[in-house]
C-alpha cells in the first residue's frame, strides 16, 4: 500500500505572528489536499516561494492572487489587499528558533557561518550574498543505501561592498 501524501499545515503556535490570510490559505490547501509543489506548478513559482507566500514572507503579484483564489476557492477580495502589500518579514517565529527543523538550519549558520563567509570572501572579495536578489530550492536525494538526503540550494547575487 503506497504511503499517503502528507501535507504541511499551519503551526497554531505562530498564527498570531502571521498575516490574517495565512490561516485561510493553509485551511484551503489542506481541504483541497494540495502540496506546495502542486500549488507552485499552478502559480509558475518555486515551492519555497509559494510557502513563503503562505507565511507572509513573500509579496504576491496580482497574478499570484488570481491563481491562488481560483485554485484554493478562496475569495480574491479576502486575500488580495494583504497579500499584495509589503511583507513584514522575519517575525514568523521566535529567535532563536524552537521548532527542531528550523533550529537545525539556524545551527548550520551558527556552526558554519564564518566558514561560509571566509570561502565566499576568498572567491568573490569583500561583500555579501543578497537575500533579495535570491532564489532557493529544496530537493531530495536517495543514496545507494536508501537513505534520504535533503539538498538545499541557496543562490544569491554577490554584492561587493563599495568604497566611499
Curated annotation (Swiss-Prot):
Activity over temperature: Thermostable for 1 hour up to 60 degrees Celsius.
Catalyzed chemical reaction(s): cyanate + hydrogencarbonate + 3 H(+) = NH4(+) + 2 CO2
Pfam family, one: Cyanate_lyase
Recorded effect of pH on activity: Optimum pH is 7.6.
InterPro entries cross-referenced by the UniProt entry: Cyanase, Cyanate_lyase_C, Cyanate_lyase_C_sf, Lambda_DNA-bd_dom_sf
Effect seen on changing residue 107 to A/D: Abolishes catalytic activity
UniProt-listed GO biological process terms: cyanate metabolic process
Molecular function in Gene Ontology: cyanate hydratase activity; DNA binding
Factors inducing expression: Induced by cyanate and down-regulated by arginine.
Keywords linked to the UniProt accession: Lyase
Gene3D superfamilies with a match to the protein in the record: Cyanate lyase, C-terminal domain, lambda repressor-like DNA-binding domains
Function: Catalyzes the reaction of cyanate with bicarbonate to produce ammonia and carbon dioxide.
Protein's name in the database: Cyanate hydratase
Species of provenance: Sordaria macrospora (strain ATCC MYA-333 / DSM 997 / K(L3346) / K-hell)
Amino acid at each position: 500500500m503506497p504511503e499517503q501524501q502528507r501535507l504541511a499545515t499551519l503551526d497554531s503556535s505562530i498564527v498570531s505572528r502571521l498575516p490574517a490570510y495565512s490561516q485561510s490559505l493553509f485551511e484551503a490547501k489542506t481541504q483541497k489536499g494540495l502540496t506546495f509543489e502542486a500549488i507552485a506548478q499552478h502559480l509558475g513559482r518555486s515551492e519555497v516561494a509559494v510557502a513563503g507566500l503562505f507565511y507572509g514572507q513573500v509579496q504576491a503579484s496580482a497574478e499570484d492572487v488570481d491563481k491562488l483564489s481560483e485554485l484554493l476557492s478562496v475569495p480574491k477580495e479576502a486575500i488580495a489587499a494583504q497579500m499584495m502589500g509589503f511583507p513584514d518579514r522575519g517575525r514568523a517565529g521566535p529567535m532563536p528558533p524552537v521548532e527542531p527543523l528550523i533550529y537545525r538550519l539556524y545551527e548550520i549558520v551558527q556552526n558554519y557561518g564564518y566558514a561560509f563567509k571566509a570561502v565566499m570572501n576568498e572567491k568573490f572579495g569583500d561583500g555579501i550574498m543578497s537575500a533579495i536578489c535570491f532564489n532557493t530550492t529544496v530537493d531530495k536525494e536517495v543514496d545507494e543505501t536508501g537513505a534520504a538526503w535533503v539538498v538545499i540550494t541557496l543562490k544569491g547575487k554577490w554584492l561587493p561592498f563599495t568604497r566611499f
